[in-house]
């Protein structure tokens, strides 16, 4: 089967991606039993609170750094308990794989998965700083040129002295805007213009010399 040219390494779909989004944290301690209990379990600020930078490598692989801010409120469940509040900050480094090539030439749909490691600070948790193993699933919807919408769900497994600590597990969801920087083509076109200008200049000089 024929593959897209960028998949074969001739052209990259982008060089960098940046994004800003809203994030919601589900830390109710119920694993995935009630993943969409927004009213009782989801903590989310009203303003965009997550940033992302993605560097494309090759063959659908990229490296992503993300940071997020949130705030726990006393009316939400935290490890099956209410009355807890405090600051939440997460930082993550993930390796991402895009399935964009499977849907080519449908350029607007870009699903991906990613794995990585992170650190999470939670005032509401007994051990304020924990490590986590990230398992992420997301979608980019390219709606206008290099602009798109990104939807992502992350399962974060807490890493503690006991390696995996279920009390430190949580889910994080995000929805926001992304922009991709593609490789510039101006260098080649400028060279062609320079070549044409030099060639015409040589002709002009030659004609002038002949008249003398």
Go through each PLM region and give its residues.
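Outer-membrane beta-barrel translocator domains and adjoining extracellular loop/strand segments
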Residues: 30-37, 75-82, 123-131, 161-168
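Residues that define the transmembrane beta-barrel architecture of outer-membrane proteins
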Residues: 14, 43-49, 85-91, 109, ...
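Transmembrane beta-strands of outer-membrane beta-barrel proteins
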Residues: 16-20, 63-65, 91, 109-115, ...
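Residues on the lipid-exposed face of transmembrane beta-strands in outer-membrane beta-barrel proteins
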Residues: 20-22, 51-55, 93-99, 115-119, ...
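Predominantly the C-terminal beta-signal and adjacent terminal strand-loop region
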Residues: 6-7, 142-212
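Short loop/turn motifs that connect adjacent beta-strands in outer-membrane beta-barrel proteins
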Residues: 4-15, 59-60, 100-110, 143-146, ...
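Gram-negative (and chloroplast) outer-membrane scaffold detector with strong preference
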Residues: 55-130
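Short glycine/proline- and aromatic-enriched beta-strand/turn motifs that initiate or cap beta-hairpins
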Residues: 2-54
């Amino acid at each position: 089967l024929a593959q897209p040219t960028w998949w074969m390494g001739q052209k990259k779909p982008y060089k960098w991606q940046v994004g800003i989004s809203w994030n919601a944290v589900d830390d109710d301690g119920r694993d995935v039993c009630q993943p969409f209990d927004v009213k009782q379990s989801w903590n989310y600020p009203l303003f965009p609170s997550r940033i992302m930078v993605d560097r494309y490598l090759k063959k659908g692989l990229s490296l992503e750094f993300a940071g997020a801010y949130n705030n726990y409120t006393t009316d939400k469940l935290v490890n099956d308990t209410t009355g807890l509040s405090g600051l939440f900050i997460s930082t993550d480094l993930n390796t991402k794989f895009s399935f964009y090539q499977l849907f080519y030439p449908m350029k607007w749909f870009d699903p991906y998965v990613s794995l990585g490691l992170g650190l999470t600070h939670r005032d509401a948790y007994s051990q304020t700083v924990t490590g986590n193993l990230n398992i992420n699933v997301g979608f980019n919807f390219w709606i206008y040129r290099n602009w798109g919408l990104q939807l992502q769900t992350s399962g974060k497994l807490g890493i503690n002295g006991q390696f995996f600590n279920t009390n430190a597990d949580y889910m994080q969801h995000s929805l926001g805007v992304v922009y991709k920087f593609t490789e510039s083509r101006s260098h080649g076109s400028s060279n062609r213009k320079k070549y044409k200008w030099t060639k015409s200049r040589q002709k002009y000089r030659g004609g002038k010399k002949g008249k003398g």
